[in-house]
């Protein structure tokens, strides 16, 4: 239930009152994420970053599209939104692109190092390729970059060296007025 989720997140927010930032990540359900964001907005004044995890079909496990996530989370007043886990940075480009069409907020990407081999459990994207793929997403307004499953400090170091001479490119385009459910966006 929404109220129960809200109370759960409220308790966490209050317990972590000394945190610098609130991060909700690896979310699949937009309704739950709404409860979390509202609990944070109503119980602290910290910046809020949110990421959802998307499948190969471009939707979360519960069917949320990147556009619906972007519209809803922008409307809720988060400070940044994006994607983490599930896939490699190359496979997440369509997700990041779709989000960028519906928000001017800074985007977050914390991709996996690809997908693990079912036999060896080794991830298939090495640090150089990972950093290259992640950096190709900067054009969509990505400001927060990291790594999730299969990454390690070598990946983050490579990203750092790749972005050292690049400036954040905020999105300044006009974003159409929209309404949405958790699965469909309608432009007005």
Where in this protein do the model-derived segments appear?
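Domain-level signal for soluble alpha/beta catalytic cores
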Residues: 1-188
